[in-house]
Design a protein with these regions (language model features):
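Boundary regions of SH3-family modules and the immediately adjacent low-complexity/disordered segments
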Residues: 2-61, 83, 87-92, 97-98, ...
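Short, contiguous, helix-prone interaction/anchoring segments in small proteins
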Residues: 64-66, 80
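SH3/SH3-like (including bacterial SH3b) beta-barrel domains
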Residues: 75-87, 140-152
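Hydrophobic beta-strand signal
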Residues: 92, 154-157
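A structural feature that tracks compact, well-ordered secondary-structure segments
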Residues: 148, 158-159
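Catalytic cores of peptidoglycan-degrading enzymes
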Residues: 185-227
């Protein structure tokens, strides 16, 4: 009954439900109270309660990853930005409705919505972007056409190296701006200096815009610490 008097942000409530479901499922406890619980929470305005119930008792989530340079993690479909997810970030995928995927970031456990077409099944990544931003080129040549740009801490897969460039699933990236996942920096403070003078952006996680949480998270993440 004490839960009824608590105020939740949408993402906090979703997280609470997911965490509770995990505990109950592990103990094989039924939870017929779910519909009653949803009837007095703001969560019912975000997702149909039957979909939530299916989510709550569904089979285990699937492992996916972000396939865009970066994408906003939203508190509701078309809603406010809560955080940003970077290319190669691992997420737990719970389901889709009306073109929106409901996911949980495996690094910080934030949950929210991203467009369905911005996630793909998880793949093995070998390297991580170690520069504030890096270009992806069509060919292993700086005069080649750049076809994409990736932010700090984006993860890619090595295919081959030529002329100082690494071929990845996206194209060619300068080797100087990549590090093996097994050879990451050790000092988050030094990493944070790469983002000096970055403009402030609420929920931002890149050198195009970042907030205090994002700065700490990216600095720790590049050193191999989930945060």
């Amino acid at each position: 009954s004490g839960i009824k008097n608590r105020l939740f942000e949408n993402h906090q409530l979703i997280q609470f439900l997911l965490d509770s479901a995990s505990v109950f499922k592990s103990k094989k406890i039924n939870f017929p109270w779910l519909e009653n619980f949803l009837s007095f929470t703001p969560f019912k305005s975000i997702i149909d309660k039957n979909k939530v119930k299916n989510l709550f008792i569904s089979k285990d989530s699937k492992s996916y990853e972000i396939n865009m340079p970066f994408i906003d993690l939203l508190t509701a479909p078309g809603g406010k930005r809560n955080r940003q997810l970077i290319y190669g970030s691992k997420v737990k995928y719970f389901g889709e409705a009306d073109g929106w995927a409901f996911v949980q970031n495996t690094y910080d456990s934030y949950v929210g919505y991203v467009p369905q077409n911005t996630i793909v099944p998880e793949t093995k990544k070998t390297h991580i972007v170690s520069a504030p931003l890096t270009h992806v080129f069509l060919e292993p040549n700086i005069k080649s056409r750049n076809i994409e740009i990736l932010p700090l801490a984006a993860k890619v897969s090595r295919q081959m190296v030529e002329n100082g460039f690494m071929e990845t699933e996206l194209g060619w990236i300068s080797v100087a701006q990549l590090k093996r996942k097994t050879e990451l920096p050790k000092d988050p403070v030094e990493v944070s200096k790469l983002l000096q003078n970055t403009p402030y952006l609420w929920g931002g996680n890149t050198s195009l815009g970042i907030d205090c949480s994002g700065l700490i998270q990216i600095s720790m993440l590049l050193c191999g610490f989930a945060c």
